[in-house]
């Protein structure tokens, strides 16, 4: 009698439409309950039984129940699952398989089976790639996954690398393929093999892609010739090797080893500018005025060179600083180093005055043993030799940006527009509270941005700089010429690393078309999208491997009195994050470690400060001493506490 009753259907419909609902993201906790976060202000409690239907990170719609002043959420439908493809550790019990996702807030094992075509016999502790197949909110009885790829065994010393590369779906080895002979590009190459070109790199570098040669003129100017390795002399556009490089977009540099964009015989041999070997190059010659200005007579041309010395950063820096026992092999090489130092000083002064110079941060290098164990982590400060190469490359990239813009009107450009226009009013208000006055429209211009950056760089600490970072936009890769606010330049297009950046290979082909006087099509936007995505994934992979290695390195310091100097890099409601100065590891200090009485403690992300009883005790950029309280290997997180 009730089956087809229209009134009943209408009543059901009414009840359904009147029931309050909310859409948001599930946040799991370690206690079994969770929260539905609707926005920054509003969240609803999800009781433990209801959490069984969802997973941390799922975007869902939930019914909101109100009982005795308390609201709770009952998951109703799935908008977007958190897990689709993931990595994890296999559990095996009575021949039944399950997988625990490798994620700090996902602790539950998900029943699974090997997908069709996966031959591996999975054992307890194996690492695998899995894909979700069932979800309770899709009408399934429970969660279920399929194992689509075996990564490695639990006792493999190189787990951090293989698991991270699998997680981000990145290649594990160099691409296949060989380039047997140079292409006939119809380019006339100048013979510069007699000139004293030198390369300056880390001692262990094999893929040398830049060589430098400087000379002085009678009227006090400097001529700099930058010669860059020429992989596009071997790799035809649209060839198998080219397409593989296009997908990879970059060489992936991970702690301990790299996965090259090109086959190793190209990156480390045929294209590498090895000492005393004749190599084809794409070259740029520029004239530097006394104040470091790059004059208008920029020239790009194809050439052959023979590097006369493979120099190492530390040797060159020591020699220029009058330390150590290393000496250049000849007077000619010594003269080159001295001239290149002059080039560096002129360009550095020009950039200080007319553009922007990044503050020097050390690079951290992991020293690894045979089995991937971390023997040491070394902070490598940026010294004079690093700056010689950096200034030469930036100058060469400015030249390419100008020539591509003026001759073609397009290229592969690194573009950074400074601040997001939507944020400049807030930015000006924040700066005003610190007695720095800016015009919200003026900071959107290159000149206004540079003026503000110089003012911030002159501040006694980096505190204010850290506060405004969230208002900045991200750098992008674009085929359209545009300014790079971060560098303080009108245009910037890189072409100096074609062995390890596909965008630089594209710019090589464009520059060669200009040299030959040919027309050439604008690069496809898909290429720049792929580059941006790969850059993001490679950075995440590098960070993930580093986190794992930091946890291994500091594990034996947990619970000891060993003190580390640490810079506060972020404050959140739950505590603060710090970076250890000596090795670059990031650690978290939970709020209870800062002060025992929660009501007397205010951790403000907005202000970047921690107040105790109304007094600012810690702020971002402060350097404090910490000890390591705990290292959680399964989540690769390091917990620290202020040293007393």
From Swiss-Prot:
One of its GO terms (molecular function) is exoribonuclease II activity. Its EC number is 3.1.13.1. InterPro entries: CSD, NA-bd_OB-fold, RNase_B_OB_dom, RNase_II, RNase_II/R, RNase_II/R_CS, RNase_II/RNase_R, RNR_Ribonuclease. The gene is rnb. Residues 561-643 form the S1 motif domain. Pfam families: OB_RNB (PF08206), RNB (PF00773), S1 (PF00575). The lineage of its organism: Bacteria, Pseudomonadati, Pseudomonadota, Gammaproteobacteria, Enterobacterales. It is found in: Cytoplasm. It comes from Klebsiella pneumoniae subsp. pneumoniae (strain ATCC 700721 / MGH 78578). This is Exoribonuclease 2. One of its GO terms (cellular component) is cytosol.
